[in-house]
């Protein structure tokens, strides 16, 4: 079960990183999905950091489980 969550987290993390604009304008400038550009960038940054932390935590947990 954790393997599936880890895989989905990795895919979502790749997607979140790919939609970041290198000029720090973000996803919201192209499509006003979140209402404002600043809000879109903040939401995307928070989601990306959450996915990074979740991915690393799951990696450590799965690594520990496979050792024993």
Swiss-Prot record:
GO cellular-component terms in the record? chloroplast thylakoid membrane
Q: Which keywords are on file for this protein?
A: Chloroplast, Membrane, Plastid, Protein transport, Thylakoid, Translocation, Transmembrane, Transmembrane helix, Transport
GO BP annotations, alphabetical order: protein secretion
**Transmembrane intervals:** 1-21, 44-64
Membrane topology note: Multi-pass membrane protein
Report the locations given in the UniProt record: Plastid, Chloroplast thylakoid membrane
Q: Which InterPro entries match?
A: SecG
- Please give one Gene Ontology molecular function term for this protein: protein-transporting ATPase activity
Q: In which domain of life is the source organism classified?
A: Eukaryota
> Which purpose does this protein serve, as stated in its record?
Involved in protein export. Participates in an early event of protein translocation across the chloroplast thylakoid membrane (Potential).
Q: Family per UniProt?
A: Belongs to the SecG family.
Q: What is this protein called?
A: Probable protein-export membrane protein secG
* Source species taxonomy: Eukaryota, Cryptophyceae, Pyrenomonadales, Geminigeraceae, Guillardia
């Amino acid at each position: 079960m954790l393997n599936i969550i880890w895989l989905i987290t990795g895919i979502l993390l790749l997607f979140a990183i790919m939609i970041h604009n290198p000029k720090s304008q973000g996803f919201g400038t192209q499509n006003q999905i979140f209402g404002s550009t600043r809000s879109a960038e903040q939401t995307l940054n928070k989601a990306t950091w959450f996915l990074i932390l979740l991915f690393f935590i799951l990696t450590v947990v799965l690594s520990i489980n496979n050792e024993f």
